[in-house]
Amino acid sequence: MQQIQVNLGDRSYPIHIGLDLLKQQQTFQSLQSKKVFIVTNDVVAPLYLTQVKAALADCASVDVFVLPDGEKNKDLAHLEQIFSALLEKNYARDTTLLALGGGVIGDMTGFAAACYQRGVPFVQVPTTLLAQVDSSVGGKTAVNHPLGKNMIGAFYQPQCVIIDTQCLHSLPKAEFDAGMAEVIKYGIIWDAEFFLWLENNIAALKALDTQALTYAIAKCCAIKADIVSQDETEQGVRALLNLGHTFGHAIEAQMGYGNWLHGQAVAAGSVLAAKTALALGLLDALSVQRIENLFRAFDLPIDGPQSMAFSDYMRHMRRDKKVLASKIRLILPQAIGQAGIYSDVDEALLAQVINPS
């Protein structure tokens, strides 16, 4: 088992990465609470709930709340259902919430933990690649609103993150590929050598080779832990992690949450960011081609929806959380392994990138 530390003073926590961790009692023995409330969904529950409950049996009493699967259920109505379940059973602040699932479950459970009785501990147990390398680490918790993705939320750090690489063997191919979009993102914004490693290990990753997966997950978590330790609440360098997300969130909102997987939207958004950087003279054409080719290797889209006009993008992008002083801020790659934050990109240039004539 590998361990990576997120250093945030008295709120620091470990990320545990290994094979078959969910079957091992020692995985959960460090939990502070003797009462655990598991939040999961109706897809993950049949796969992993029994083994997690068995691993917890000797160290905590366990209750379970099962949500319907899907991004469309990441809303205030389903969040309220979690609160109602906790209140009806009189759970107090000595309860630990455990998020067993992908990014939707992790985001909702974390936000519920941040709000319930003004804050209770929670643990992230991500079961998708996207959640393992990105959303489970760093304390971003939220639900969606019809007018924007993740618009209602809080920064609230987990007690720990438990990543079992065996979970990836049950993922549908499209979900695995969507997770690779976030993996590739780390190479683009932060680590050119990792990007090259990804280019050279496509076959091993697609074959779910344990060693390759563990290396990639640990590398992503280490990068994110470093960034979050420097900038927990996204006042500076953490914003780089949003490469592709400004365009991507616009795609998700326009097409309806769940119709495009988050990773698919991030892939298309990252290519739009790279093309914007090319148009501005920040990035060379070969780097854009490498970015496109790596996303293509995992069957990810490199173009946004044909039905989506420039005006559709702009309507949603103006509501983006990174907007500052009414200016859209874009994360743009400057080279493979390096990115920056840019405001006031000319809208005529963006229009040409998004809908080239």
From Swiss-Prot:
Keywords: Amino-acid biosynthesis, Aromatic amino acid biosynthesis, Cobalt, Cytoplasm, Lyase, Metal-binding, NAD, Nucleotide-binding, Zinc
Residues involved in NAD(+) binding: 69-74, 103-107, 127-128, 140, 149
GO molecular function, a single term: 3-dehydroquinate synthase activity
UniProt keyword ATP-binding, yes or no: no
Pathway assigned in UniProt: Metabolic intermediate biosynthesis; chorismate biosynthesis; chorismate from D-erythrose 4-phosphate and phosphoenolpyruvate: step 2/7
EC class (word): lyase
GO cellular component, one term: cytoplasm
Domain of life, per lineage: Bacteria
Similarity remark: Belongs to the sugar phosphate cyclases superfamily. Dehydroquinate synthase family.
Descriptive protein name: 3-dehydroquinate synthase
Native source organism of the sequence: Shewanella denitrificans (strain OS217 / ATCC BAA-1090 / DSM 15013)
Primary gene name: aroB
